[in-house]
């Protein structure tokens, strides 16, 4: 996890503009650098480093002797950089995984570069020889990227929007800042003046298609066919491979553990592989919740079963409520369920940073979207519509769960790794017949659970534990975290304010006091930027006025039984 920032064609003094880059210093607590581009007094790169791979030679922008005209600033991890070196005979100057981007670009251009990378990334690549600037972001947007581009060619790029919103420019004091779309690259011409012109924005691959880099994957070709045993075996092999490749790190590895299926599978496979690879230190797992919350109790069972060094972070309602404003500032969103779920993740990340030496943190994000884990999937009209909904959720991950996971961990200088969003794993899972992927026997993620049923990785009660939203599982069964928040907020927002909410906030108007409260805080820090959230996250096919799983009938009936 690092923070990247760059300006091209600035009309203002760069030494003043660079102050904006310090707003993302939390993403890279180990070192930072600002560097002007040769021959351009109005172009600059900024970089905040979290040293995870090649701690000695990993500063950016990356430049190598072989390609003196290329400048690279990137945030991410390229898991197949060694395989690509062997495949194409690249001669690396450093041990930095991102150096492969320079070699791939020199060999085949930007489209081949983006398509061949197995990993998570957001990058800015400058080619001064051909006067080109390239931006690119990974398939699911696991690594964030924002940009601002004015009509007269001023370009600003940053890992988080907060590093761009206060930039000054002659034609606009507050230029429009937008997220860069996942799975795309952009080509821009660099003029002698330092200004840029956008040439094209291209989607370089789809999450449904098997990635080009699969050809040199260590797993090789999988057995074909959709009989159940073959499918289950392929799921296990690909998921284990997804975890294995993410073990690439020179810093200590830990794992978030809620006691739910997803994080428990990640932790169990992770610890198994660490033993096989003879990694000497114990795996630290981290659970958070209020006293005796379902997540804490379940996580203890998992930790005892797999033998991890387990840490529990217990918080009370006051601590959670006090964190709301910090969380919204970090998130750069006002989405209801995202804010709720982020508070626990933010607090546990804070604990990890202060109390442990784990820096690379594994988590279970992406599984609910991929494997149809949300409660409302039980109400899908058909397997085909459930499959379409799964794809929609994956497409929008960068607005919700992936955003939450990145910002809450990066706020405390941690790097998150999400094996469920491994591109080869997701493309295979999405290629399966729709009827195989739907909930069965009243149980969501049925196929995923089946695939690991005979592995002994987890206790049976954890493998088949019903879905519970993270923001619900961290509180008690009797009173959920969202109810605690709503009770507090009810005293902070009066009825009259809510009645006039649509007048004050015509875009995505708040319809509840809780929503209004979050929106107020968001507008305080990011006034006029409400379009960053195109819509609120809400379940489909059900009559729901709140995104919490505990408001859904299926959930209530399961609890009563």
From Swiss-Prot:
Gene3D superfamilies: Glutamine Phosphoribosylpyrophosphate, subunit 1, domain 1, HUPs. It catalyses: L-aspartate + L-glutamine + ATP + H2O = L-asparagine + L-glutamate + AMP + diphosphate + H(+). The active site is at residue 2. InterPro entries: Asn_synth_AEB (IPR006426), Asn_synthase (IPR001962), Asn_Synthetase (IPR050795), AsnB_N (IPR033738), GATase_2_dom (IPR017932), Ntn_hydrolases_N (IPR029055), Rossmann-like_a/b/a_fold (IPR014729). The keyword tRNA processing does not apply. CDD domains: Asn_synthase_B_C (cd01991), AsnB (cd00712). The record marks 365 as: Important for beta-aspartyl-AMP intermediate formation. GO terms for molecular function: asparagine synthase (glutamine-hydrolyzing) activity; ATP binding. SUPFAM superfamilies: Adenine nucleotide alpha hydrolases-like (SSF52402), N-terminal nucleophile aminohydrolases (Ntn hydrolases) (SSF56235). ATP binds at residues 256, 288, 363-364. It is an enzyme of class 6 (ligase). One of its GO terms (cellular component) is cytosol. Residues 213-536 form the Asparagine synthetase domain. One of its GO terms (biological process) is positive regulation of mitotic cell cycle. The keyword Ligase applies. L-glutamine binds at residues 49-53, 75-77, 97. Its EC number is 6.3.5.4. Residues 2-191 form the Glutamine amidotransferase type-2 domain. Keywords: Amino-acid biosynthesis, Asparagine biosynthesis, ATP-binding, Glutamine amidotransferase, Ligase, Nucleotide-binding. Pfam families: Asn_synthase, GATase_7. Pathway: Amino-acid biosynthesis; L-asparagine biosynthesis; L-asparagine from L-aspartate (L-Gln route): step 1/1. This is Asparagine synthetase [glutamine-hydrolyzing]. The gene is ASNS.
């Amino acid at each position: 996890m690092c923070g990247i920032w760059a300006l091209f064609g600035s009309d203002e003094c760069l030494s003043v503009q660079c102050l904006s880059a310090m707003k993302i210093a939390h993403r890279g607590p180990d070192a930072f650098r600002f560097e002007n581009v040769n021959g351009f007094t109005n172009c600059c790169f900024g970089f905040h480093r979290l040293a995870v791979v090649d701690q000695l030679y990993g500063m950016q922008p990356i430049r190598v002797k072989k390609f003196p005209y290329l400048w690279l600033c990137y945030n991410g991890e390229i898991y197949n950089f060694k395989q690509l070196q062997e495949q194409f005979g690249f001669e690396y100057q450093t041990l930095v995984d991102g150096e492969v981007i320079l070699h791939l670009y020199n060999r085949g251009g930007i489209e081949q570069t983006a398509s061949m990378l197995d990993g998570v990334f957001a990058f800015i690549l400058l080619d001064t020889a051909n006067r080109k600037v390239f931006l690119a972001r990974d398939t699911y947007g696991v690594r964030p990227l924002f940009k601002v581009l004015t009509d007269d060619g001023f370009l600003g790029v940053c890992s988080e929007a907060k590093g761009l919103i206060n930039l000054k420019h002659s034609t606009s004091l507050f230029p429009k800042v937008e997220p860069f779309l996942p799975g795309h690259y952009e080509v821009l011409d660099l003029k002698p003046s330092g200004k840029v012109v956008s040439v094209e924005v291209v989607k370089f691959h789809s999450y449904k298609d098997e990635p080009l880099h699969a050809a040199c994957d260590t797993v090789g070709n999988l057995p074909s066919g959709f009989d159940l045993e073959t499918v289950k075996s392929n799921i296990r092999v690909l998921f284990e491979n997804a975890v294995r490749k993410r073990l690439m790190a020179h810093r200590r590895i830990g794992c978030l553990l809620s006691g739910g299926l997803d994080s428990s599978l990640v932790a169990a496979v992770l610890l198994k592989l660490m033993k096989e690879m003879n990694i000497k230190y114990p795996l630290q797992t981290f659970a958070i919740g209020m006293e005796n919350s379902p997540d804490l109790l379940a996580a203890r069972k998992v930790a005892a079963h797999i033998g991890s060094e387990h840490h529990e972070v217990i918080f009370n309602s006051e601590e959670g409520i006090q964190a709301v404003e910090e969380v919204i500032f970090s998130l750069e969103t006002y989405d209801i369920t995202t804010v709720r779920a982020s508070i626990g993740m933010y607090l546990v990340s804070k604990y990890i940073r202060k109390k442990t030496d784990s820096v690379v943190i594994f988590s279970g994000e992406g599984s609910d979207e991929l494997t149809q884990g949300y409660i409302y999937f039980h109400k899908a009209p058909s397997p085909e519509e459930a499959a379409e909904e799964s794809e929609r959720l994956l497409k929008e991950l960068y607005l919700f769960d992936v955003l939450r996971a990145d910002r809450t961990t990066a706020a405390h200088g941690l790097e998150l790794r999400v094996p469920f969003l491994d591109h080869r794993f997701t493309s295979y899972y999405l290629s399966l017949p729709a009827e195989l992927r739907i909930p069965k026997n009243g149980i969501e993620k049925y196929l995923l659970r089946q695939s690991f049923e005979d592995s002994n990785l987890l206790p049976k009660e954890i493998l088949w534990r019903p879905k519970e939203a993270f923001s619900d599982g961290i509180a008690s069964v009797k009173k959920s975290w969202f109810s605690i928040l709503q009770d507090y907020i009810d005293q902070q927002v009066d009825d009259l304010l809510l009645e006039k909410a649509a007048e004050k906030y015509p875009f995505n108007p708040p319809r509840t006091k809780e929503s209004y409260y979050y929106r107020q805080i968001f507008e305080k820090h990011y006034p006029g930027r409400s379009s960053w959230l195109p819509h609120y996250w809400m379940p489909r096919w059900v009559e729901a006025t709140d995104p919490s799983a505990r408001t859904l009938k299926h959930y209530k009936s399961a609890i009563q039984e």
